[in-house]
Amino acid sequence: WEGAKVAKGRDRWAAVVREASKQSVRPWLPDVLDLVTTKQLARLASTDQAEGVRMLVLEPTAATPLSALDFDRRDLVLVVGPEGGITPQELDALSAAGADIVRLGDEVLRTSTAGPAALGAAHLHSGTGGARRARRRARPLVMRETLSWYP
């Protein structure tokens, strides 16, 4: 994305986050930040891993299913690629930086639904159930050209 399309996409995601937060009765509104490159995202993965944050990259061909991970209540960074997938080079860079490459299940979901489905699955498997927690440092939900901060 370039130029006006960046601002339009960011505004769209900000509206989605705002409405989803209202609907789920969140006590705070996550931030929607600027786009990042794969290189910047890999740096974020490396930094986050050092800080005890886990980055998950959804990839339909990954050997490890999301449900097989041990969720230890760390903050998560979730990366969802575009329709057509994340390139092998991007997967290699993110994996080398410490990200876990996982698949959501046997079915391939659209980009717009894969992120929310993965967040719900991660929430379920983390053992937090429906418990509400105090605001923690916001972490990004990444959809290739879009970076939205999410807890």
Kindly give the residue locations of the regions a language model identified.
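RNA substrate-binding interface of SAM-dependent RNA methyltransferases
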Residues: W1-L56
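Glycine- and other small-residue-rich loops at beta-strand/loop junctions that grip anionic moieties
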Residues: E2, L33, L58, E83, ...
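Short, glycine/charged-enriched secondary-structure capping and boundary segments
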Residues: K5, D70-R73, D92-L94, A117
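A short acidic, often aromatic-flanked loop/helix-cap motif at beta-alpha or helix-coil junctions
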Residues: V36-R43, A63-P65, V108-L109
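Active-site/ligand-binding-proximal alpha/beta "capping" segment
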Residues: M55-L91, D100-V102
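Structured adenosyl-cofactor binding patch, chiefly the S-adenosyl-L-methionine
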Residues: P88-Y150
